């Protein structure tokens, strides 16, 4: 595997955050008029209960660093290898970019709609994501690598997504984020000696924010049944596979991070897939067959393709560009074959909302 370019300066951290690749977090814009037309009257009771939870703000005091935090960073992190240091810094940069992406999107929606239900929801979620991004950015500042988030908002490229794509992608991003964080938290509670940075101690209550955000999009999707039936199921299937594949490939580019926690990247990812499959039954009538041999082989093939694309990019020149194109086509073909693997089908529950019980 090729070495990841090192993050040693704020400029490199900012450059990494600004990247627009298949695997990097993106910034989004959408159709605000369509967002304004969202109607949640069919799930009013569950919606109002959820907004009351946001208003209660049970995490208002959670994202505060303890006085011991910097000392623990100095003591624990001084023991990690340079390679692990780089993978962890890459994780922080990717995470702060992802959290801030949500903050920017939700804030822009709430500024551009009049619908009181949507406006209130987006304001609450932007508040949460702002806290998350700020907390991670402070962890980067401990290494002298803080990112100018205002500058990132102005300079990073934006991708236009229709509202339904926002709903699918963001629902899955929030729920898979919950599954990732809670799996790491539980592992490190069992093995505190492997907690090489204090930020992981915040993950339990943190991931409950992610879970609640996902609940919000679950309610929106269930309030608009046409988004999860008929031809739109093809889009559901696409986003399920795209989100899972992106996570799998990205995680296998930084295996030392999981190894340091006592996890193995493949086992960890399939545990996260399993949790996300169970959760997403609240809103999607289909789920990916993650145990199908062709699914697992396809994921491994995508990792192999990524390493080949990176090698071709490093080679450069005409030959390198031709190799990149060939391997990119191989990746697209692999994704297409995985898309055709039969999915599992199930009935939707009468009650949409669920508790974070993992």
Swiss-Prot record:
User: Pfam families from the xrefs?
Assistant: Rubrerythrin (PF02915)
Q: Which CDD domains match?
A: ACSF
Q: Name one GO molecular function term.
A: iron ion binding
Catalytic activity reported? Mg-protoporphyrin IX 13-monomethyl ester + 3 NADPH + 3 O2 + 2 H(+) = 3,8-divinyl protochlorophyllide a + 3 NADP(+) + 5 H2O
What does this protein do, in the record's words? Catalyzes the formation of the isocyclic ring in chlorophyll biosynthesis in aerobic conditions. Mediates the cyclase reaction, which results in the formation of divinylprotochlorophyllide (Pchlide) characteristic of all chlorophylls from magnesium-protoporphyrin IX 13-monomethyl ester (MgPMME).
Q: What class of enzyme is it?
A: oxidoreductase
Species whose genome carries this gene: Rubrivivax gelatinosus (strain NBRC 100245 / IL144)
Cited HAMAP family: AcsF
In what pathway does it function? Porphyrin-containing compound metabolism; chlorophyll biosynthesis
* Annotated EC: 1.14.13.81
Q: Which residue ranges does UniProt annotate as crossing the membrane?
A: none
Q: Is DNA repair one of the keywords UniProt gives this record?
A: no
Keyword terms of this UniProt record: Bacteriochlorophyll biosynthesis, Chlorophyll biosynthesis, Iron, Metal-binding, NADP, Oxidoreductase, Photosynthesis
Against InterPro entries, the record matches this protein to:
AcsF, Ferritin-like_SF, Rr_diiron-bd_dom
Q: Could you tell me what this protein is called?
A: Aerobic magnesium-protoporphyrin IX monomethyl ester [oxidative] cyclase
